[in-house]
Design a protein with these regions (language model features):
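Short N-terminal binding/cap micro-motifs at the start of the first secondary-structure element
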Residues: 25, 61, 92-95
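Phosphate-coordinating loops and pocket residues in cytosolic domains that bind phosphorylated ligands
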Residues: 27-30, 64, 73
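An acidic, glycine-rich surface segment that forms the CoA-thioester-binding/catalytic face
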Residues: 37, 41, 68-95
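Generic detector of intrinsically disordered, low-complexity, polar/charged segments
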Residues: 53-55, 61-62, 80-83
Length: 95
């Protein structure tokens, strides 16, 4: 499946998840959080996936964190149950 804000590469038991918003230093906004939540849901369900590496595109930053510019521009702020980047509250993910 293709994603708008991330690139997924699968190599045997490894997933490489590349944040893909280099124009915003890979800062995460609500749509990206939702997308990453889906990605990590799929990673968790995949019995052949053992390890995920999260990296960022571009040469300025891995990730600037929360996209404050999106928020200041009035972007809709929503959270996902699995936490920031679809990952920080995912206590049941033991890969």
């Amino acid at each position: 499946m293709a994603y708008e804000f991330a690139i997924i590469e699968k190599k045997e038991h490894l997933w490489i998840i590349t944040l893909n918003r280099p124009e915003r230093m890979n800062a995460l906004h609500s749509p990206a959080h939702k997308e990453l939540d889906e990605i990590f849901n799929n990673f968790q369900k995949d019995n052949e996936a053992w390890v995920a590496i999260v990296t960022g595109s571009g040469d300025r930053a891995f990730s600037a964190g929360n996209d404050l510019k999106y928020q200041a521009e009035g972007g809709k702020m929503e959270s996902v149950p699995s936490g920031f980047a679809g990952l920080t509250s995912r206590y049941d993910l033991n890969k």
